Amino acid sequence: MDLMSLTAVELGKKIQAKEVTVEEAVKAAIASIKAKEEKINSFVTIDEEGALKKAAEVQAKIDAGELKGALAGVPVAIKDNMCTEGLLTTCSSKILYNFIPTYTAEAVKRLEDAGCVIVGKTNMDEFAMGSTTETSAFGATKNPWNTEHVPGGSSGGSCAAVAAEEVPFALGSDTGGSIRQPSSFCGVTGIKPTYGTVSRYGLIAYGSSLDQIGPIAKDVTDCAIILEAIASYDTKDSTSVNRDDLKFTEALVDDVKGMKIGIPKDYLGDGLDPEVKSAILAAADELKKKGAVVEEFDLGLVEYAIPAYYVIACAEASSNLARFDGVKYGYRTKEYTDLHNMYKKSRSEGFGPEVKRRIMLGSFVLSSGYYDAYYLKALRVKALIKKAFDDAFAKYDVILGPAAPTTAPKLGESLSDPIQMYLGDIYTISVNLAGLPGISLPCGMDKNGLPIGLQLIGDCFKEKNIIRAAYSFEKTRELKRSTIAEEYSNKNTADTNKSAGAQ
């Protein structure tokens, strides 16, 4: 049996039933990663030794009856912008090529407490700045459905690892769509929770007012269970919200009768690929058949989301990334004349072009002559976008639309046109600006065999609504396996049959 073809919950059940040991699960993940990495490059670091050591510890706790949760013993991959004590954490940047944290991010720690085993850190756009996972200092990640295409970003490594069945699930972060857009491109399911639901402690910041950690998995059930495990109030994160409604698995009910679902007309206009539009409207019809009330409405302000986002996110990035100067950790230039020259050369050599572009943009909009004209104006637009969503959620339980305007572009297409790359997040960015929860899940395939993602958006702290709608829609479809996953599975079957024949 190919253990990595199972969902996290299915694998967890087999481990609890003693059908599979934790060591077997971890070894299966490591073997799968090693077999596929040359083709997709979804990992920056593979921690085989640490994972096997942890597997033995977790197995002992399971055998002693101390660990009984759904995720106990399940291998997981972590996006490389979350601190992991003693394990290299690079943000896919040259400037952090040798950074080993002395503490673990709260969300990661909660997974470890649940008995999950970290097998490695996944590739990403450098400092989460990008939508294709091509800005990584460690090379581009490829899409497991077609390796000539991008996996999306910035959590492209995590999404590709799940789609390729290297691991059952992974953690990603979402600042402007970085979980939902690559989930769409890779045909997996990903949730960006309400801002403040999952602790940002230990997440290396890009845009502090926008960043959120969330799960990436094969299906909605896994995502709900993982989100339940990582969501918590954390005093170490000043933006953490003390919620009492974190039982997200309660929403795993196939019932949308009477649910009011709105489709913004703004999401169906120019720039949306016809095949994507057709798949999204077909998904809406499926929910309608199940009893949901579906109608189109005018959301407004969508065209202002991208400029407002890039002003705010880049301003916050220019401040957050000022700490990387080559003094106490990370990359330091070899030759310099004085301290100022060392700062300048270390940052110039350590950061990639997209990161430098955003730092410069952020520094510009925060400068004294332009602060009011750009940054304050962007904050006002952010408030107006939140108001537009508030008005919509006074009428609707869920907003439905595409996760991305197209399916995955080819490698290199977006890098040559940064504006086009930014426009790829047009349907996800406003959700971050408003602090709302969103989920992306597969809803179809285009003529080239690339996945199309459906996005469901909920009101603040109403993750249960989007999980219920997503779960109900998912029941109308069969999960599909990526090309890379199928190839590996077929090869394993052929090898097994060949071995049996030889005997």
UniProtKB/Swiss-Prot annotation:
Domain of life where this protein originates: Bacteria
Keywords, alphabetical: ATP-binding, Ligase, Nucleotide-binding, Protein biosynthesis
One biological process term in Gene Ontology: translation
Pfam family, one: Amidase
Keyword Transferase: no
Listed InterPro entries: Amidase, Amidase_dom, AS_sf, GatA
Gene3D superfamilies xrefs: Amidase signature (AS) domain (3.90.1300.10)
Catalytic reaction(s) noted: L-glutamyl-tRNA(Gln) + L-glutamine + ATP + H2O = L-glutaminyl-tRNA(Gln) + L-glutamate + ADP + phosphate + H(+)
GO molecular function, one term: glutaminyl-tRNA synthase (glutamine-hydrolyzing) activity
Active site, UniProt feature: 79, 154, 178
EC annotation from Swiss-Prot or TrEMBL: 6.3.5.7
TM ranges: none
One term under GO cellular component: glutamyl-tRNA(Gln) amidotransferase complex
Its biological purpose: Allows the formation of correctly charged Gln-tRNA(Gln) through the transamidation of misacylated Glu-tRNA(Gln) in organisms which lack glutaminyl-tRNA synthetase. The reaction takes place in the presence of glutamine and ATP through an activated gamma-phospho-Glu-tRNA(Gln).
Protein family per UniProt: Belongs to the amidase family. GatA subfamily.
PANTHER family: GLUTAMYL-TRNA(GLN) AMIDOTRANSFERASE SUBUNIT A, TRANSAMIDASE
Subunit and partners: Heterotrimer of A, B and C subunits.
Name of the featured protein: Glutamyl-tRNA(Gln) amidotransferase subunit A
The organism of origin for this protein: Agathobacter rectalis (strain ATCC 33656 / DSM 3377 / JCM 17463 / KCTC 5835 / VPI 0990)
